[in-house]
């Protein structure tokens, strides 16, 4: 059987990124304390109680999914902004973007009797149009309960991010991201993975927070999940992370359709909240635009 490497929170970031480059997945153990775990469980319980199971084999007939986590759990906001995770995401995605954004948030609860999910690569959400050499996703799964092979721990095929797209793994190449509650599994958008089979009476609960380059469309529509009247309650850092910021000098501006005085014409999204604006808030020079047209 394949193996997912497990490391401690004080492991040097260079080593973490080296493992991610080699295997496309690793577990950092004991990141969250019991208080944080209890807060997340309490925040999510009302939504999980009323959410219906999936309606197909991929989403899982015994699996519940709850999104819009930034609006539903303050502690999940803290996870999204976790300093180590964001530092790793910035370095990992950095070769292919100026900055990154929150791409997806979901609490996924695999119930008793659930069957395993088909192995897949998350980068497929963009339809296969992006060259494989561009890594599009830095993903995290926070274990709110223990993850075991028996209760549906994520299946993953270490090293499969370097395979031909049509190669299928042998049974002995599949590993399980087993971890204690409070740990986090980090993986890439190019590695084969999928939810596991739950042969227990337990519920396996994880918080999935994924990051992507800020020039790509997000899987979870952040602006409908968190419209301005909700996003105004977030910190400026979280607003920027979910996309209320520009991704380049002329990427991501907005215009107020009700503005009859021309005050909010093609401005940076931060302006709507009165936040400090970033380096893209100034007018681009012709040199900026020309240099930004190609990295070669």
What are these regions (language model features)?
Residues 33, 77-81, 133, 175-178, ...:
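Aromatic-acidic/polar surface patches that form glycan- and anion
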Residues 104-107, 140-142, 207-211:
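A structural signal for short, well-ordered beta-strand segments
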Residues 108, 146-147, 190-191:
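Short Ser/Thr-interspersed hydrophobic loop/turn segments at strand-loop and sheet-helix junctions
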